[in-house]
A protein has these predicted regions:
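Catalytic nucleophile-elbow at a beta strand-turn-alpha helix junction centered on a G-D-S/GDSL motif
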Residues: 1-16, 37, 64-66
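Short beta->alpha junction loops
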Residues: 30-37
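Alpha-helical cap/lid subdomain in secreted, periplasmic
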Residues: 20-27, 39-193
Length: 194
């Protein structure tokens, strides 16, 4: 079965481990770049899906949507600085996700939503805990569409001090391996349901 991973740098961090863990069970692919915010997803989703047939698509957007930016969208801004704003406000995020889900559902693949991992205190350009609001918005979209959730946020929170880098949304190599165990297990469960 062919599996496509869509996500940001967090998914980049766990891809190789997931591929190794599913060796002999699935052919694991990943989009060729950082998925960025949902606005980037909408621009690129058709190219990422291509003409290939996908059995499972495991996808996430969030950490870039809830990032604060100023004039230059490629640079993070202090959330308290004048002129800084969310890259994708919550209502737009929810609307964009619903649109992305429709486009992915059209492929006939089994979809698995992966919720957004924790934003710790001191994380540059982000506000601690903002992932909760974005995950709630995403949950409304996924519930309406009947899409299961890989709750990577709760999984990461269980060992956050051991697996996440200090004041950073990223993870240590062993932290990415820990995330990969959950991702691979959820994908494996859904392969048999296809």
């Amino acid at each position: 079965p062919r599996v496509l991973l869509i996500g940001d740098s967090i998914s980049m961090g766990y891809t190789l481990d997931v591929r190794e863990m599913l060796k002999g069970k699935a052919n694991v692919h990943r989009i060729p770049t950082n998925g960025g915010p949902t606005t980037n997803g909408l621009k690129n989703i058709k190219a990422w899906l291509g003409d290939s047939k996908w059995d499972v698509i495991h996808f996430n957007w969030g950490l870039h949507d809830l990032k604060y930016i100023a004039e230059d969208p490629s640079k993070r801004a202090d959330p308290k600085a004048p002129g800084s704003h969310l890259q994708v406000p919550l209502a737009d995020y929810e609307k964009n996700l619903a649109e992305l889900v429709k486009l992915m559902q059209a492929t006939g693949a089994k979809l698995i939503w992966c919720n957004t991992t924790p934003v710790p205190a001191g994380s540059d350009g982000r506000v601690e805990g903002d992932e909760k609001k974005y995950n709630e918005a995403a949950a409304r979209v996924m519930t309406a569409a009947g899409i299961p959730t890989d709750d990577l946020c709760t999984h990461a929170n269980a060992k956050l001090k051991d697996v996440q880098l200090p004041a950073n949304v990223h993870y240590s190599p062993s932290g990415y391996h820990y995330l990969a165990e959950k991702v691979a297990s959820v994908i494996a469960e859904n392969l048999s349901k296809k």
